A protein has these predicted regions:
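Hot-dog-fold acyl-thioester-processing enzymes
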Residues: 1-82, 148-255
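Generic structural hydrophobic/aromatic packing signal, biased to beta-strands
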Residues: 3-5, 36, 85, 139, ...
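Residue-level detector of alpha-helical recognition elements and their boundaries
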Residues: 18, 116, 203, 222, ...
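HotDog/MaoC-like acyl-thioester-processing domains
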Residues: 79-193, 267-317
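Catalytic-pocket segment enriched in acidic/His residues
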Residues: 231, 238-282, 298-300
């Protein structure tokens, strides 16, 4: 419940057991990005102050301790560039899950500002008490060279290569259609929703507490400004969690098969975000269909802040 509140998602299936049971689950459902909260159970997690160690956020001074290497989770380095969840099934409250970490693919490419960028996948496998897979989470970090010299950043450092602004596919009525949440959908259909209005700094603090990610960039103004930013900005995973609100009116609860996002640029307090879901393909099987969605989240200036995709279980029509 606390996690759902932290991403501004008030779908009752995340709060009330009776509602979840009506949807076919035996307890309240976990929100789509809830697995980020596993970091609460990592005793060495370095985005949370550790006993006896100097925390690098502000105290008397804007920056404390040695920040020559900016801490990041699970051994990665650099910025969180992308995240992907593969849902083997959706977990519910009361379950015990077993967690295993491993490193996935590593690759490099030339950055826009010169120098090589190295991308690393950190894969977290969640299994139930019987050893059956529940969720696979893939965190993609990109190592950069911006944290040298004076160690200061700018919003340009946090902005990835802009995603192409492709037009939606032409709406097609015919063989390729499916039923999501009781409604017929076709390739080219779009669904748009304002997912947050006037994002508050308090929402960033709520997400820090719910997820366990207390990096000072997201709640500590003196630290963020000392590092060259205009102030605090939202966690990429907060933006991804808020974006998922758009699913509530479009798909059935627990129907997500896969959900991925790429963080294009920072989201600042005060911004209003609108998410568009576009049906780009429908894969029809013998018993069920899979709807492919392209995802765009934009700020009030119509700038892309997140792009993504989802695979959704649906009914044939």
């Amino acid at each position: 419940m606390m996690f759902a509140r932290s991403v501004n998602d008030y779908n009752e299936v995340y709060y009330h057991k009776a509602v979840a049971e009506q949807a076919g689950f035996n307890h309240v459902l976990a929100p789509p990005t809830f697995m980020m909260a596993v970091d609460h159970y990592d005793e060495t997690y370095n985005r949370r102050p550790q006993p006896g160690e100097v925390w690098f956020g502000s105290g008397r001074d804007p920056i404390s301790g040695d920040v020559s290497v900016r801490p990041v989770p699970k051994g990665g380095s650099g910025f969180h560039a992308e995240e992907r969840f593969i849902y083997h099934r959706h977990p519910v409250a009361g379950e015990t899950l077993i967690v295993e970490y491993r490193t996935g693919k590593v690759w490099s490419k030339e950055g826009r500002r010169g120098g090589a960028l190295t991308f690393t996948e950190e894969i977290t496998e969640f299994s139930d008490a019987q050893g059956k897979p529940v969720i696979t989470a893939i965190w993609v970090s990109v190592a950069t060279v911006i944290n040298v010299g004076d160690g200061k950043l700018s919003d340009k450092d946090l902005t990835q290569e802009k995603a192409s602004d492709e037009n939606s596919p032409e709406r097609i009525e015919g063989v390729h259609k499916a039923v999501m949440a009781g409604k017929i959908c076709h390739i080219g259909d779009t669904f748009e929703k304002i997912v947050v209005k006037d994002l508050k700094r308090t929402q960033l603090v709520m997400y820090s507490g719910a997820s366990g990610d207390f990096h000072p960039f997201h709640h500590d103004g003196p630290f963020a400004r000392a590092k060259g930013m205009d102030g605090v900005f939202a966690h990429g995973m907060l933006t991804m969690g808020i974006t998922a609100i758009a699913f509530n009116d479009v798909i059935d609860d627990g129907a997500l098969l896969e959900y991925g996002a790429r963080f294009v640029q920072p989201v600042w307090p005060g911004e209003t975000l609108t998410t568009k879901l576009i049906v780009t393909n429908i894969e029809q099987g013998e018993e069920q269909a899979v709807v492919i969605l392209t995802i765009e989240t934009r700020n009030g200036d119509s700038q892309l802040v997140l792009t993504g995709d989802a695979r959704v279980q649906a009914a044939n029509f």
